[in-house]
Structure formats: C-alpha cells, structure tokens
C-alpha cells in the first residue's frame, strides 16, 4: 500500500495546507506548535486524504480515489463515507470482491443509508447476485421512486429470478420515467416472451427496433 498520493499537485497542496496550519499555531504559541507539529501533520494528512479521495470518487477518478482512501480506511474506526467511496472505487477499477465486501460492511453499519443501499444493490446486479439485489433495490425504489436506473435494474434482477410479472411492473415504471428508452421496451418484450405472452411482447419489440433505428440516423 502506497503511503504517498500519486499526484504531485496533491502533495504540494497538502503541505501548503499543513504549513498554513502550523503558521497559525506559531502565531499563538511557538513552543506548543513545534511540540504538536507531527500530530498536526498526521491529522491534516488524514482529513486531506479523506476529502480528496471522496472528491476523486465522485468525479469518476477511481484509481486516484483508491490511492487516497486506502490511506485513511480503518476497519476498526469505521467511516461509512470512506468505505462507501472506496468500495465504489474498487468496483469501478475491477476489484469487485473487495468493493462488495466494503459496501456490505457499510450497509451493516448504516442499514438506513439509502446511498449505500443503492450502490450495493446495483453492484449485486452487476455481479449477478439477484436475490440479494432485489430487497435493497425495492427499498431504494420506495425511497426514491423517480430513479430510472434503480427501477430498470430492479426489473433486470426480478427477470433473472423468473419473477416476470414483477419485472414487467418495474420496467413499466422505468418506461414512464423515460418513454423513449429502447432497452426498456426490449426488456419488457423479453419478459413477456419468457411468460409465453407473444402478443404482449410484439409491440414492445417493434417500439424498441423503431427507437434503435431512429437513434442510428
């Protein structure tokens, strides 16, 4: 595990921030400032890495987020925000098992955190753990009924579990949020097909093809 950020600008910013903090302490009490310099350094470093790592994750700079957040993650002093964003960064950089483990720890620590439930539910769909995804995404959909991605992925999970009626219901809610989303029409059609309802499937297949042709123009 690296002990330094990969970006030189981050390092310069960190020590500038540290220098300003020490300067303020020197103005108040020079002796105490020198005595506490090393502890201040550690405290500022931890806060800086945490904030910068979360910022990287939110901006989609997942490799940079991993470098920063690994410095501050502590399994014994659990910080849900750090674990959540480090978990996301792990998943996005291919370390899916490590990311899922952190997200599961996060939901155990904060079961009512909708953000954590959303990310973990979507991750479960990604890794095809559909039975684990459904209860989380149902909870999230109830809390945030206009989230298209949650409604669509909930439909995907239900469809893969053979719960086609429920899947179609979820897909139709997603379709109400984005009426011209071809993949939703196609998903509804496939669910109907698996139920043997060919007549119900046909208009959705046609609509999906029509939307695909329109987007290709």
Swiss-Prot record:
SMART domains: TPR. GO terms for biological process: magnetosome assembly. One of its GO terms (cellular component) is magnetosome membrane. It is found in: Magnetosome membrane. Its main location: membrane. Residues 41-112 are annotated as: N-terminal domain. Residues 113-217 are annotated as: C-terminal domain. It is a peripheral membrane protein. Keywords: Biomineralization, Magnetosome, Membrane, Repeat, TPR repeat. The keyword GTP-binding does not apply. SUPFAM superfamilies: TPR-like (SSF48452). It holds the Pfam family TPR_8. Induction: Part of the probable 17 gene mamAB operon. TPR repeats lie at residues 12-44, 46-79, 80-113, 114-147, 148-181, 182-215. GO terms for molecular function: identical protein binding. Belongs to the magnetosome MamA family. Probably forms a large homooligomer on which other magnetosome subunits assemble. Required for formation of functional magnetosomes from pre-existing vesicles. Forms round, 20 nm diameter complexes with a central cavity. Probably binds MamC. Interacts with full-length Mms6. Protein missing TPR1 (residues 1-41) forms an N-terminal domain of TPR 2-3 and a C-terminal domain with TPR 4-6 which can move with respect to each other, hinged at D-112. The second most abundant protein in purified magnetosomes. This bacteria makes up to 60 cubo-octahedral magnetosomes of about 45 nm in diameter which contain membrane-bound crystals of magnetite (Fe(3)O(4)). This is Magnetosome protein MamA. It comes from Magnetospirillum gryphiswaldense (strain DSM 6361 / JCM 21280 / NBRC 15271 / MSR-1). The lineage of its organism: Bacteria, Pseudomonadati, Pseudomonadota, Alphaproteobacteria, Rhodospirillales. The gene is mamA.
